[in-house]
Amino acid sequence: MNIWVIADDRTGNTHQAIALAAQLTGKYTTITLEYNFLAKLPNFLLQYYPIHIKRELLQDIIDKLPPDMIITAGRRTAVLAFYLKKKFENIKLVQIMQPNLPYNIFDAIILPYHDYRDLLYCGPAKILSKNIKSHCKVLNYSSRQHDIEKMMKIIPINGALNNITAKFSAASLELQKHYPHLKQFTAVIIGGNNKRFSFNEDIAILFSSLLNKIYSNQAIPFFISFSRRTPQIVKSIIKNNTHASTMIYDPSKDTDYNNPYIDMLANAKYIISTADSISMCSEAASSGKPLYIFYPPNFNSLKHKIFIEQLVEQKIARIFNESITMLEEYSYKPLNEAKKVAEIIKFALKINKS
């Protein structure tokens, strides 16, 4: 099967599309879009013609042999998929996240529960997976018939699609090369500010105190990875208030070691993650390692809360707060939404991995 992944400057979206493509086929082609100043226009204007894509690039895409399937993530790439579907009628379209276009254009639409609350009450893609057992309560839509057609193309997922575990073997070797004497550690994955959360000094002080409480009871060194979103003051507070044995990766500093994030997830005994990134928490939840999520008092993002509450209910994650004095080993079925979605799509569209 010939699959195109339509990528753009939204790295997180692209990673999700690639994760799904890798589960569907051994070979896929990534086409990276370049936008012009019209990319900010709403999709109801762009749907008639993808004027937001640079003309030479669009022509080059049109001139290629059409694929069997196109995977897109996010609204701007969805517009190109819609346009190509009109030109090449037989291609299948799989969209990740809301396309802001009519659902009947697509063969499957993958939506996270946290972005679309109705999914909490629906069975996964009733047509796409009609012989696959539903894993959530089915809502009675008798009074909402207009929703039925929409819901039938939807495959709901927890969090963000990823293929992080496929990289674990190489990651283990890389970590051993740089830290040959490191036997065990707790990975501490720290994000930063987002639209609905400010990682401020008070939160950094609270987080540091929680880490110190753990270390005083359980002397396993921390390996901290900061994000590019982590405020400098937060980095300083955490660096100055954690035990001397703590290893720290700061992407703003020069280093001969590329971001060890994947290496840390692959080799950690425990994982502590901040709650501000759904992608980050999804990847940690895919590792199979005991996962503790720091969920500070000023954290106000509803979609993040919905996702984290699901992880806790499924006994994948635990909340990292003042009640935690030691990290415990426990097991769970790792999150693997890319594989689940790929199986549903292969069954529904009658395709084989080739």
UniProtKB/Swiss-Prot annotation:
The lineage of its organism: Bacteria, Pseudomonadati, Pseudomonadota, Alphaproteobacteria, Rickettsiales. SUPFAM superfamilies: UDP-Glycosyltransferase/glycogen phosphorylase. Pfam families: Mito_fiss_Elm1 (PF06258). It comes from the Bacteria. PANTHER family: MITOCHONDRIAL FISSION PROTEIN ELM1, OS02G0535700 PROTEIN. This is Uncharacterized protein RP120.
